[in-house]
């Protein structure tokens, strides 16, 4: 990623440890703030993306662990019957998030190129590398939620020579489980479980009816929501821009926004802001998995010609994010100090938690996310 640059290089590659720490923290703050997933991070179980910042030490060593607590299955005792000896042990599932290092670097063309530029190399590199890391974290997070291999981009196209499939945590990406993999049948207005993308038709576009049915489905499957103001359960829903456009054109969706919000420019129907419908916070994001980058015949539908989107319905602990330590900032000189380079490195990991659900006869299911295949 060569950049035309200029600046005072008398101290290049000679920063003190304290100065490196400052640049590293500035870089990470900028990357974190630019990442879309940052809005959904939290350190406890009432977070859509639970952020693990410390390693847990046990007999197996230091590991990044996310803990899922299953609901109790017993009914206790009644009256004066003996409770002691009839206690129910809490069932906890400790799931390890594998860690790996992501690195990238910039190098400029040389001192003569510096003289032709007014851009400071160190500052520009920080900005460019921060955006790179933020964007790649977003991509990996949404591929993990969709259960799609890192060998693909979020538009369904192959990455080519990308190293992402070699990330340690890439091996833990799992397809959506049977009862968390749905198709919206737009003709009959029903959700179809254990769905296949080949069954998607052009009529299966997002609608208000889908949102209502999906929330009801999640409640019956005990997908735990996020506690909002007043203790109300909230969920996050994600669509790519074209799927969101189809939802915005649904007459029932339009009618509910018109009647449910204040009229005028503050109405999200006109303002284009984030919409909350029946406890569902609706988000539009370009990295929600879709088929835009696939060749005709390889998309969805019986003939492979239907463009689609894997709409995400997320509750608590939908994703685990291991965020271990500050990034590393390294400056280096090349070619007899004629060229300069900057690299950054961050240790992290993603995991979509799964657990044996007592509500699905003990079958392993995705813990906090439902994928819904829709036409877009």
Swiss-Prot record:
Function: Assembles to form an icosahedral capsid.
Source organism (scientific name): Pseudomonas phage KPP25 (Bacteriophage KPP25)
Covalent S-S links between cysteines: none
GO cellular component: viral capsid
Subcellular location: Virion
Keyword hit for Cell membrane: no
Protein name per Swiss-Prot or TrEMBL: Major capsid protein
InterPro entries: ORF017-like
Classification lineage: Viruses, Duplodnaviria, Heunggongvirae, Uroviricota, Caudoviricetes
Keywords: Capsid protein, Virion
